[in-house]
C-alpha cells in the first residue's frame, strides 16, 4: 500500500500557510478507467492558492477539508481495467483541481496528457504556454514585424509571451519591476526593457512609442492599462 501526503485546506482565511496542513493516508489503487500517477512537480500559483483559502475562486466552491493544487507532471505507476493509454512508465501532465499538491493522484485516464519527459519546464508550458499562445495568436492575431508591448513580462505568463513575440520576429517592449528581471528579458531578446521602478512606462511610451504599439498584452490593469491604450497605434 502506497502512503500519500497531500496539502489540504482545513479552514478558510487569508494565509495559505495557516489555512493548510499536510495529511498522510494510504493511496487507493486505480479503478476501471483510472490511472495512478506519482507527481514529480506541481505548478504553484500563489494568487489562486490565496483565493482558494478565501473561497473566492468563481468556478470552485471551497468547503474544508479541501484538496489543493491544479497542474502537475509525473509518471504513471499503475492503470485500472480498460485503460489503453497512457501506459505505466509514461510521463504525463494533469490539470485537475485538488490533485497537484500531493505525492500520488488518481484520475481518469483521459485526463492524463502524455508528454516527452518529466521536467518543470514542460509543466510550465501547459497553463502558461497555452494561455500565452491563445492570447497572442487567437486574441491578439500576432503576425511579424509588429511592435508588441507586454507587462509583467518576466512573470509566469509574461515570460512565455515575450519569448513567443520575439521568436515571431516582432519588436518587443517588456515591462518589469527589477534589475534581475530586466537583464533576463534583455537576454531573451526583448528590444526595449522598461523597469518601472527606474522609468515611467508612460513617459517612455510617449517619447519613444507614441501611438505606435500594435499589440499590448497587459496582466496588470488599472492605470497601466490606460497608459497602454493611450499609445496604441491606429487599429492596434
Specify the residue positions occupied by each region the protein language model found.
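N-terminal glycine-rich beta->alpha transition that marks the start or flank
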Residues: 2-3, 24-73
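Residue-level recognition of short, solvent-exposed, well-ordered loop/turn junctions
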Residues: 31, 87-88, 108, 143, ...
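A glycine-/small-residue-rich N-terminal strand-loop-strand element
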Residues: 52, 73-97
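Mid-domain Rossmann-like dinucleotide-binding core that forms the NAD(H)/NADP(H) cofactor-binding site
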Residues: 87, 122-199
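A structural motif shared across PLP-dependent enzymes of the aminotransferase-like
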Residues: 96-109
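Glycine-rich cofactor phosphate-binding loops and adjacent beta1-alpha1 units
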Residues: 188, 192-236
